[in-house]
Design a protein with these regions (language model features):
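N-terminal glycine-rich phosphate-binding loop for ADP-containing cofactors
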Residues: 1-255
Length: 255
């Protein structure tokens, strides 16, 4: 991977960050600097992409449609294929730890529909990903991977309404919304790092210019309106609070 995410802790001084930055450049990599937070930037935002794909599968949208729509939108790999490669079991471990951390603080973590589907794949259906022999895909020895046939039986719903535009927007907008939230929360401190990190760290389509540039390319008002439409249809993951809206405007570059 070209990108290296440098994590600044509460007591990390500027000299240490600068040394790390120079070292990463010397290695021929692309550095970005983010502040310490759960999932940092790239893992946190990448998670929204793959879990949105899983959520759509749970809604009854055919797996092949989801995967093909993602690639057609410019994403390098479909969300279900990525989950297989990174291991569904890893996502479930993260979910279990998140629940435990919230419980330790006296809170209850509300898992997304995508997370619950992945949990079912691992714990009930025993499909943990490529390393375990199969997840959303089967991996025949000496052959090309193919979608697990049981996905059709288990999840597809005849007559469910879907369109490619909504699928692609859900995959792209969900990541841009999370990026705006990271800016609002101070996890990210620049649009530059957001754009570089999203393209080289999580495969956000290069044609967009990055997750934040995607917002500015749509037009802020149009982006906010589309987010409201998606939130009304597909859930609060697309919601922009006042802080995120302010961050989008306050960080907008002046060219």
């Amino acid at each position: 991977m070209k990108l290296v995410e440098i994590i600044r802790g509460e007591t990390t001084d500027d000299e240490t960050v600068a040394r790390a930055f120079d070292y990463v450049l010397a290695l021929g990599k692309l550095p970005i600097v983010v502040n310490d937070s759960r999932g940092f930037y790239t893992s946190r935002t990448f998670g929204t992409y793959v879990m949105e794909g899983a959520a759509m599968l749970g809604e009854g949208i055919p797996a092949a449609v989801i995967e093909n729509a993602a690639v057609q939108a410019g994403l390098p790999v479909g969300p279900l294929a990525v989950l297989d490669e990174t291991a569904l079991s890893l996502s479930v471990h993260v979910l279990d730890q998140t629940r435990a951390d919230f419980a330790a603080e006296g809170k209850t973590y509300e898992a997304t529909s995508g997370e619950l589907l992945v949990e079912r794949m691992v714990k009930e259906l025993k499909r943990s990903g490529r390393v375990a022999g199969g997840g959303f895909y089967d991996y025949p020895q000496g052959g090309k991977k193919q979608l697990w046939p049981e996905l059709k039986t288990l999840f597809e719903k005849p007559g469910v309404e879907w369109n490619v535009k909504d699928i692609q927007d859900r995959l792209l907008y969900r990541q841009s919304v999370e990026t705006a939230r990271c800016l609002a929360e101070g996890v990210l401190t620049s649009v530059h790092d957001a754009n570089i990190g999203s393209i080289f760290g999580i495969g956000f389509p290069g044609w967009t210019g990055g997750a934040m540039q995607f917002i500015y390319g749509q037009g802020i008002d149009a982006f906010e309106q589309r987010c409201a439409e998606l939130a009304a249809k597909f859930g609060k993951g697309f919601g922009l609070n006042a802080e995120a809206k302010a961050a989008i405007r306050n960080f907008q570059p002046n060219y």
